[in-house]
Amino acid sequence: MGKIYSFVLVAIALMMGREGWALESESCLREQVRLRAQVHQLETRVKQQQTMIAQLLHEKEVQFLDKGSENSFIDLGGKRQYADCSEIYNDGFKQSGFYKIKPLQSLAEFSVYCDMSDGGGWTVIQRRSDGSENFNRGWNDYENGFGNFVQNNGEYWLGNKNINLLTIQGDYTLKIDLTDFEKNSSFAQYQSFKVGDKKSFYELNIGEYSGTAGDSLSGTFHPEVQWWASHQRMKFSTWDRDNDNYQGNCAEEEQSGWWFNRCHSANLNGVYYRGSYRAETDNGVVWYTWHGWWYSLKSVVMKIRPSDFIPNII
């Protein structure tokens, strides 16, 4: 009888243990569900915070690009004023970036991108890279300059007034670096590059050509078109200041400022088309002798340097 009683007690204890285990398991499951919900909630909040931070950073970046920043310029230590990027290079500053220069006859400093590669000392007067800047502008903008003087690949036009102040200092070489949408590169180089003053309507003068892209500026690629396609000794034109040789208005038709003739075999300030572009119009970023009139290039850099430049390797 005692054995039966003991067995019953053990059975009851086991049953109670199972019920307790079941209750404990159910409680653990509920706790797991609660914790998972909390984790999911926290993950959602973290993602929301990350999105907000990204938006704030983007807004700050846009404000920075709009306003510019002194911190975007490379500090020269207040050593002296420089007439162009070649002087900066030969004074020991070999890093490409934005610097401030003051040509000999300039009344004030202005910012410019110095390309310290490719032999160093290049003053960049124009850049096209992504179509972020509008180059269909009037006379005053082209005279004084416009664009992004903050980002290293930012688009800008240095200004006809500033280009004149640079090129009257001596004999300068112009180098034009071109890139297409198939990742090919080419260049055109001209000796004796000079832009006239305001009275000459910033007339273009170029000398001997060399390079791989062909001579689109002087129009010597074909004698029958040179009379209307050459840009040599052409005055600068904009939509509101027509100085070309065409009965119409080249700048208005091509939607850019340039040294138009009737109208062009090169227009590096033309409309920027994102992607390889071919059509029955020539108002893109054009260099005829490399890709013809109906191909708009991906990127352009126009840069100048004294023709007698000797790099200081120290």
UniProtKB/Swiss-Prot annotation:
GO terms for molecular function: identical protein binding. GO terms for cellular component: extracellular region. Disruption phenotype: Mice develop normally but develop spontaneous autoimmune symptoms caused by T-cell activation in aged mice. Mice also display slight metabolic defects: mice are heavier than wild type mates, have abnormal plasma lipid profiles, fasting hyperglycemia with enhanced gluconeogenesis and exhibit differences in white and brown adipose tissue morphology. Mainly expressed in liver. Also expressed in brown adipose tissue. Pfam families: Fibrinogen_C. Disulfide bonds join 85-114, 250-263. Transmembrane segments: none annotated. Blockade of the FGL1-LAG-3 interaction using a monoclonal antibody stimulates tumor immunity and is therapeutic against established mouse tumors in a receptor-ligand interdependent manner. Immune suppressive molecule that inhibits antigen-specific T-cell activation by acting as a major ligand of LAG3. Responsible for LAG3 T-cell inhibitory function. Binds LAG3 independently from MHC class II (MHC-II). Secreted by, and promotes growth of, hepatocytes. This is Fibrinogen-like protein 1. The lineage of its organism: Eukaryota, Metazoa, Chordata, Craniata, Vertebrata.
